[in-house]
A protein has these predicted regions:
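Conserved small/polar residues in nucleotide/adenosyl-binding loops
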Residues: 179-186
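Conserved alpha-helical scaffold flanking the Walker A/P-loop in AAA+ ATPase domains
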Residues: 104-119
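A short, basic N-terminal segment
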Residues: 1-41
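Conserved NTP-binding/hydrolysis module of P-loop NTPases
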Residues: 11-12, 71, 81-100
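Conserved catalytic segments around the Walker B and adjacent sensor/switch elements
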Residues: 68-78
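Short regulatory helix/loop adjacent to the ATP-binding pocket of P-loop NTPases
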Residues: 166-178
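Walker A/P-loop nucleotide-binding motif
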Residues: 43-61
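Conserved Walker B catalytic segment
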Residues: 114, 121-160
Length: 186
């Protein structure tokens, strides 16, 4: 059965290459509002939901609204890397020279985040998709990696996006459930 004809659709909205399509709903507006707030205040954000709920679509839409002269967006979905490979990849994506040793990668990542935020006056936005697969070693390191001036400054936005199991990994409770169609999404 051709559902495009049956439902009077002009195209198949479920294709992966249909990224220019965005259906604005109350829930999507709320997600975008909260992501905008995260961009303004900096720090860590978390976006979780069941597969197909529109996490990547919302992030893509949000990134399109960010001013390139004010934000440098780094997107990675390589959350299954070893910690050192993850940091080498992050250093490279930020535009820094990656190193072999973890402490060296920490240093260059922090230097690049500081350079971007202080010298270039750009807020680094680091988006880690599929973060539910990220190792606890990397998550534990984030507290150290994003500690600036004795934990008195936020130099970047870090958005972790993934399945609801990420909440359990982080041991967080859901503070605001934006939308659910059934109890299975809780």
């Amino acid at each position: 059965m051709d559902y495009t004809i049956r439902y009077g659709l002009e195209f198949n909205p479920f294709l992966k290459n249909s990224k220019e399509i965005f259906v604005s709903t109350d829930e999507s507006k709320e997600v975008l509002f909260r992501l905008d707030y995260l961009a303004k205040t900096k720090g860590f954000g978390l976006l979780t939901g069941s597969p197909g709920r529109g996490k990547a679509t919302a992030i893509r839409k949000w990134v399109q609204t960010l001013n390139n002269s004010q934000y440098k967006v780094v997107y990675t979905c390589f959350s299954t890397f070893s910690p050192n490979d993850f940091y080498r990849n992050l250093a490279t994506e930020l535009g820094a020279q990656a190193h072999y040793r973890k402490p060296d990668n920490f240093r260059v990542i922090q230097e690049e985040l500081t350079r971007l935020s202080v010298e270039k006056r750009k807020t680094p936005v680091i988006i880690i998709d599929e973060a539910n697969y990220i190792s606890s070693a990397i998550l534990n390191d984030f507290k150290l990696l994003f500690n600036f001036e004795m934990d008195s400054r936020d130099r970047a936005v870090v958005l972790l996006s993934g399945l609801p199991s990420l909440n359990a990994t982080l041991r967080l409770s859901v503070h605001c459930l934006l939308y659910t169609s059934d109890a299975a999404d809780d």
